[in-house]
């Protein structure tokens, strides 16, 4: 293992011991925010420290076995060689494990997120596809034990959505779903197509981390225009008799957020503000990323329509992820929510990219 990596690990052990001591301090115990943050840091460091301790023990075992090679007893030398083989295998395994544990973490990975799906080119067929995508993500979330809560839905007359926004909450939601941002293209024969011609339509997906109140960007109320209106679905379904739906316009950026899912105006306003916070935060993140001008490719899409990440080809039963050149012929399973076969390879590729950048340092 590189000397620089060992030094980094030694520093983390020192910090772990420091955090452990602080968690027993009555002053820290009395400060809920501080105690919560330190507890989180403690749990993040715990695995790294345990892995490094095991690594050091394996190094000691190797050194002891090497000393035994000098023994006169042939049986002892044979035992030493066996122990050396075991220790080297353990060291190799732990080195890989520790490198993964040292990878830079996206601070938002554990956050809940907002999932936004918008119909693009393709008219009614694109809106139907947006509905299919929303159903696919909802099923996937259900399989992970996550909760999906509708924030706003602009339904299409022929089914599906022109736009749908939902909040997804649960363990590590953003860290997994963030790779879904980008352009999704569908190729299939619409039900209304009498000639059997394949149509191509598209949707854009944007995944934004939900920002905790303590980290929220301060928004000047004077920079907001808030309108109320009556909620309604396509063809007048779910019509509310009161003006409970909310539209918030952030004047400096022109961002517009609507929420009409709840019957309470107060709840709709709170949800809309959360979405606005997430979008403003995304703008800041994109600015920061542009300033850093990172040369390393990013697998996390911007939600831009031009950035096509995946194609769903129904006649061939095929799904292709263009970022990692992965094609699978299990479209039926994917649209029913079995996204694991697409999500896992993307996460592995992302991890490999991070490991490569760590070894370059």
Swiss-Prot record:
The modification N5-methylglutamine is found at residue 237. Methylated by PrmC. Methylation increases the termination efficiency of RF1. It is found in: Cytoplasm. One of its GO terms (cellular component) is cytoplasm. SUPFAM superfamilies: Release factor. Pfam families: PCRF, RF-1. GO terms for molecular function: translation release factor activity, codon specific. The keyword Flavoprotein does not apply. Residues 287-306 are annotated as: Disordered. It comes from the Bacteria. Keywords: Cytoplasm, Methylation, Protein biosynthesis. Its main location: cytoplasm. Belongs to the prokaryotic/mitochondrial release factor family. Peptide chain release factor 1 directs the termination of translation in response to the peptide chain termination codons UAG and UAA. This is Peptide chain release factor 1.
